[in-house]
Amino acid sequence: MAMTVHCDIVSAEGEIFSGLVEMVVAHGNLGDLGIAPGHAPLITNLKPGPITLTKQGGDREVFYISGGFLEVQPNMVKVLADTVQRAADLDEAQAQEALKAAENALNAKSSDFDYGAAAARLAEAAAQLRTVQQLRKGK
């Protein structure tokens, strides 16, 4: 039996996952992080994107988070997400539409244009699409 670590994924809406996992892969500010049992303690920001859990037995589960924090302790990994959704529940067509709308907003700047908000919408839509693609790859 493979070594495991307890993982919790929570958001303001509540807990979406709690259980033993063999590996957690998340998208941090400096790139992807792979957390396995015995990983050094750390706290880091998470960018919008997929979180992949490899559960006992090798089954994988993918979630989308809109950002948050990752805390690693010797026997525990905790993801504190702004919002979290199971990747299977994401609507790819809606994410594509949001991506196009964000790109159009960036290209059609008006006098009251908020570049930061438009860039954030673009990044979130792109992260949702990346999550859907990762889910498809894993099947």
Curated annotation (Swiss-Prot):
PANTHER family: ATP SYNTHASE DELTA/EPSILON CHAIN, ATP SYNTHASE EPSILON CHAIN, CHLOROPLASTIC. InterPro entries: ATP_F1_dsu/esu_C_sf, ATP_synth_F1_dsu/esu, ATP_synth_F1_dsu/esu_N, ATP_synth_F1_esu_C, ATPsynth_dsu/esu_N. Disulfide bonds: none annotated. Keywords: ATP synthesis, Cell inner membrane, Cell membrane, CF(1), Hydrogen ion transport, Ion transport, Membrane, Transport. GO terms for molecular function: ATP binding; proton-transporting ATP synthase activity, rotational mechanism. It comes from the Bacteria. Belongs to the ATPase epsilon chain family. The keyword Acyltransferase does not apply. Its main location: membrane. One of its GO terms (cellular component) is proton-transporting ATP synthase complex. This is ATP synthase epsilon chain. It is a peripheral membrane protein. Produces ATP from ADP in the presence of a proton gradient across the membrane. The gene is atpC. Pfam families: ATP-synt_DE (PF00401), ATP-synt_DE_N (PF02823). The keyword Nucleotide-binding does not apply. F-type ATPases have 2 components, CF(1) - the catalytic core - and CF(0) - the membrane proton channel. CF(1) has five subunits: alpha(3), beta(3), gamma(1), delta(1), epsilon(1). CF(0) has three main subunits: a, b and c.
